[in-house]
Amino acid sequence: MASSKTLNQANLETLGANRLAQLLLELVAVDAQTKRRLRLELASANGSGDVAGEVAKRLATIAKAEAFVDWNKVKPLARDIEAQRRAIMEHIAPTDPATAFELLWKLIALARPVLSWCDDSHGTLGTVFATALSVLGALAAAARLPTDQLVDRVFDSVCDNDHGQFHGLVTLMTEPLGEAGLKSLRRKFEAMAREVQQRPPQGERRVIGFGSGGVFYEDEMEARRHERLVRQALVDIADALGDVDAFIAQCPADQRHNPAIAAAIAERLLAAGRAAEAIAALDAAEAIRRKGGHWPNWDRVRIAALDALGHAECAQCG
């Protein structure tokens, strides 16, 4: 039998509402985080609108902070942001998914300022943001937002993803965007790919590092980042649309001899019922594969492709 001094729900209930209220007031006088949590609970009694107001104010306050967060304050900050996430999902989302979606998006966007002024090497804050991101797609579907607005928001967030807070966003938004939205998003990134990155005059170029190949210039690194961003976005959109040829188009010809790239292409061709083309894609990388190395996906996809063509007896050949 548990002691009457054990901290559990049954024992606390024996104190009565008045005494518990007094104790909580004493606690919140010295604990700001507990105070904010109680404010959220009180706001929830008046409906999701009051909770939304409290959450919005807290997110704005966190976003405005500029002081560096010491390592011992990272966990409390993570708990604070997690409390806002839970309030959004538990008190707002069930009755007002559109408002919940807006607030959750703002919460995830906090990653940019927050991770800029703290050391999250243990991933404490990153886990909170990733948890919020994981339900964003379902919340967007429930909110039934206009497709054009959602396209613009996804585009802007993918482009402003310095800390990886929106990693995998296109995939998560596949359902709420729909085919039309995905194609509209693709057009935006295709237009971005056509943008010419202007190189500043040599005397104005900023050196950011040195390597065996020479000097690293800021504009060159930015151009490469731009190219990677666009290519990855178009790859994600191609996969979301099930457009194998669009995926292949994003794989440079000189990289298709890499067994890992060849396997990625072949796997998609196989899923599209194009087993013969999958074998051809794998064959293009066989020379490098035979030189050694560990290429489990190449082997796995080749076996599956041969089996699909009715050549299971050849699956282990070569």
Kindly label every feature range from the protein language model:
Residues 1-318:
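Eukaryote-biased, non-catalytic alpha-solenoid scaffold regions
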